[in-house]
Amino acid sequence: MTELKLGSLFDGIGGFPLAATMNDIRPVWASEIEPFPMAVTAYRFPQMKHMGDITKLHGANLPVVDVIAGGSPCQDLSVAGKREGLAGERSGLFMEQVRIVKEMRKQDRRRMRNHRRRTDEFIRPRYMLWENVPGAFSSGETHGADFHTVLEEVCRIKEADVSIPGPPGGAWTPAGLIMGEGFSVAWRVLDAQFWGVPQ
């Protein structure tokens, strides 16, 4: 089996790289701007390259990975915040994650065509993980509009003109699945107290 590789955006102190190594996925690079968390990951994962500020990265220039994980800042989505949602300066950085994945896939598609390989199911990154707070389900101009945007933007990485219906009953459920042509998107709310890290 081919080894999976991880790129970690909004890396913090390396939670995604730690989870990856516990699941036989090799962390290759990370993006973070805060010095202390970067020092922690440099110590814990010396082989992982630090790429810096997500807003200054271009996906075509990043090392190819199979998985992109990111937990964009939650302050604008959180029920404890001002609820600016994805329009907020911090939580809106989610769109940078989508941009980078699209740029990486475009570059990988080009590379594979140059080598005359089949492309559709092998374009990398193949997987994207987004971690955030349950407040994402209810933020936005209309209740839950931001999570609707998240789902559409993630689906549009694979299918540019896809349209996702709003939540049945007007509210997003804590778990769900979207099946598309050659892609799927799933979401789950995990309660941290059951994972040994009550918050």
Regions found by a protein language model. Give the residues of each.
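Short beta-strand element of Class I
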Residues: 27-28
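Conserved SAM/SAH-binding beta-strand->alpha-helix loop
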Residues: 34-35
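Conserved SAM-binding loop
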Residues: 41-42
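Conserved SAM-binding strand-loop segment of SAM-dependent methyltransferases
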Residues: 47-53
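Class I S-adenosyl-L-methionine
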Residues: 57-65, 77-199
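Short SAM/SAH-binding signature in class I
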Residues: 65-71
